[in-house]
Curated annotation (Swiss-Prot):
Domain of life of the source: Bacteria
InterPro entries: Phosphoglycerate_kinase, Phosphoglycerate_kinase_CS, Phosphoglycerate_kinase_N, Phosphoglycerate_kinase_sf
A GO term from the CC aspect: cytosol
Protein name: Phosphoglycerate kinase
Any Pfam family: PGK
Oligomeric form and interacting partners: Monomer.
Example of a GO MF term: phosphoglycerate kinase activity
Organism classification: Bacteria, Pseudomonadati, Pseudomonadota, Gammaproteobacteria, Enterobacterales
Keywords in alphabetical order: ATP-binding, Cytoplasm, Glycolysis, Kinase, Nucleotide-binding, Transferase
Chief site of localization: cytoplasm
Binding site for ATP: 197, 314, 340-343
Gene name of the encoded protein: pgk
Naturally occurring in which organism (per UniProt): Pectobacterium carotovorum subsp. carotovorum (strain PC1)
Pathway in which this enzyme or protein is active: Carbohydrate degradation; glycolysis; pyruvate from D-glyceraldehyde 3-phosphate: step 2/5
Length: 387
């Protein structure tokens, strides 16, 4: 994957526009989870230290496109950056016709979704973004799968388009895990529906030595083995697909589970064999035997790709399966890569972030990359590197 890297460029005195992923949760004007901003800080700091005229922009939330809405303003992000950086930081609301930036100053360009044509990758808007800079830095892996004006179009028209350190690191880590994995390679795919992850399961079944399924996805595989899954979340119409995958790939289907009579935080967890599930019960977590069996597999792995929890870990009574898996990954010597919102929440909950080799910042982009799809922003950077 050949792209120009920001770290290989001399940025002194240049107008540098960084497209970061600063789409963070905000409550009452304050950032409530700063993980994405923290991940973007090193890129901003490199450009500032080199004496560049730095602009950074992002989307935040889902405002009506083309309309200013204070609720989705990047102002809370600006306040956060002011606390973390020694350089001056300010917000620019109207910037499409040009913005003055001093060397060593950071100007945050207001939410790109306030601009008409952003999502449609409008050429006129893309050219306006491009005219703001000498160097465009794409550093938002989380939006690299979307062809939009601030992630894709701008890069076609900017004098130079390059990958920021966060995006470069993400592509290298995923490339390492998928193209030449150290073996055995184990992939974990959790989540509620097989339908949304079918392509991922299919792609991974071809490269993983073992494929661990969890959550609602695992319930469909339990049903595919002929067991009653009661009121559990599962997809009956995808049982043939699950059977096909069971024939072609080593998938350790749970042998015991934790069930409840209702989907609630206070529901009592009952441990039982998959052969004994009653009509009124629903599976909400793995059982101890199954979880330990998976932990053993993970301890012997050399590459682990983790996307999705294996149970309803948000409920304390149904957390044990995901925690057992998480701790096994943390203790493993494998190169481990984790991605997806629920997965990151589980990593935070169990405090194992420093034990995972690489944590991906992308949800949809992470899955599309794993599926083998081309990400529009990355394709654009590759094209520009050839010019």
């Amino acid at each position: 994957m050949s792209v120009i890297k920001m770290t290989d460029l001399d940025l002194a005195g240049k107008r540098v526009l960084i497209r970061a992923d600063l789409n963070v949760p905000v409550k009452e004007g304050k950032v409530t989870s700063d993980a994405r901003i923290r991940a973007s800080l090193p890129t901003i700091e490199i450009a500032l230290k080199q004496g560049a005229r730095v602009m950074v922009t992002s989307h935040l939330g889902r405002p009506t496109e083309g309309e200013y809405n204070e609720e989705f303003s990047l102002l809370p992000v600006v306040d956060y950056l002011k606390e973390k950086l020694s350089s001056p930081v300010r917000l620019a609301k109207d910037y499409l016709d040009g913005v003055d930036v001093a060397e060593g100053e950071l100007v945050v360009l207001e939410n790109v979704r306030f601009n008409k044509g952003e999502k449609k990758d409008d050429e006129v808007l893309s050219k306006k973004y491009a005219a703001l800079c000498d160097v465009f830095v794409m550093d938002a892996f989380g939006t690299a799968h979307r062809a939009q004006a601030s992630t894709h179009g701008v890069g076609k028209f900017a004098p130079i388009a390059c990958a920021g350190p966060l995006l470069s690191g993400e592509l290298e880590a995923l490339g390492k895990a998928l193209s030449e994995p150290a073996r055995p390679m184990v992939a974990i795919v959790g989540g509620s529906k097989v339908s949304t992850k079918l392509t991922v399961l299919d792609s991974l079944s071809k490269i993983a030595d073992q494929l661990i399924v969890g959550g609602g996805i695992a319930n469909t595989f339990v049903a595919a083995q002929g067991h009653n899954v009661g009121k559990s979340l599962y997809e009956a119409d995808l049982i043939p697909e699950a059977k096909k995958l069971l024939e072609t790939c080593d998938i350790p289907v749970p042998s015991d589970v934790r069930v409840a009579s209702e989907f609630s935080e206070t529901a009592t967890a009952t441990l039982k064999s998959v052969t004994a599930i009653k009509d009124e019960e629903q599976i909400l977590d793995l059982g101890d035997v199954s979880a330990e069996r998976l932990a053993e597999i993970l301890k012997n792995a050399k590459t682990i790709l983790w996307n999705g929890p294996v149970g309803v870990f948000e409920f304390p009574n149904f957390r044990k399966g995901t925690e057992t898996i998480a701790r096994a990954i943390a203790e493993s010597d494998a190169f481990s890569i984790a991605g997806g919102g629920d997965t990151l929440a589980a990593i935070d909950l169990f405090g194992i972030a420093d034990k995972i080799s690489y944590i991906s910042t992308g949800g949809g982009a992470f899955l599309e990359f794993v599926e083998g799809k081309k990400l529009p922003a990355v394709v654009m950077l590759e094209e520009r590197a050839k010019q």
